[in-house]
Amino acid sequence: MARQQGLRKALAEKFDDELKFFKGWIDKPKAVGSIVPTSSIAARRMASVVNPDSGLPVLEVGPGTGVVTRAILARGVKPENLYLVEYSEDFVRHLRAQFPGVNVIHGNAFDLDATLGDKRGMVFDSVVSGVPLLNFPVSQRIAYIEDLLNRIPPGRPIMQLTYGPLSPVPAGRGDYKVEHFDFVLRNIPPTQLWVYRRPVAS
């Protein structure tokens, strides 16, 4: 009986997350890239690049309802060492309720100095991004990735998901390397994962 109740609760929470995500997509389709949250399988792959033992905090941009956030915490990152930047006020309220202790910041991912405020000079271990970059001009995508790379050590990754077949940030347009990380079929829609890094000086 307890197991059935637990299953019903888990299904209800998943359905609630999907409703929140769909509402966010209806309200702000440019800021929300899909009508359903990222799958737990894609979330674990995205979180796999995070190094919880680096001693540095982790930045997640565009966390939505927190599926990837949960995977990052499961990697061993302490809540106080995880910073989330989310544009939707509804998602911000949800994230603060779901993840007490995590630093949830409401603001624009394309203006991180203003959004991070007194944390603008913080150096992060890595960045996990769910921002729907294909909804923005290429020049803005490049500037976004370059800005994030300025906030992590050389060689450390930015993990970015996208629903298009190609990297949303083209190679050869800035001081970064592009790596195709994975294609996750078990996601709606199927998603491509890309990694961006600054080369380590030899």
Q: Residue locations for each model-derived region?
A:
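Class I SAM-dependent methyltransferase Rossmann-like catalytic core
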Residues: K14-P52
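Conserved class I S-adenosyl-L-methionine
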Residues: G55-G64
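Conserved SAM-binding loop of SAM-dependent methyltransferases across substrates and taxa
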Residues: T65-V77
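Conserved SAM/SAH-binding beta-strand->alpha-helix loop
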Residues: S88
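S-adenosyl-L-methionine
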Residues: F91-D118
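A short glycine-rich, Lys/Arg-flanked "PGG" loop and its adjoining helix->strand segment in the class I
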Residues: I142-P154
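Conserved beta-strand signature within the Rossmann-like core of class I S-adenosyl-L-methionine
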Residues: P154-Y163
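Core SAM-dependent methyltransferase catalytic element
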Residues: F183-S202
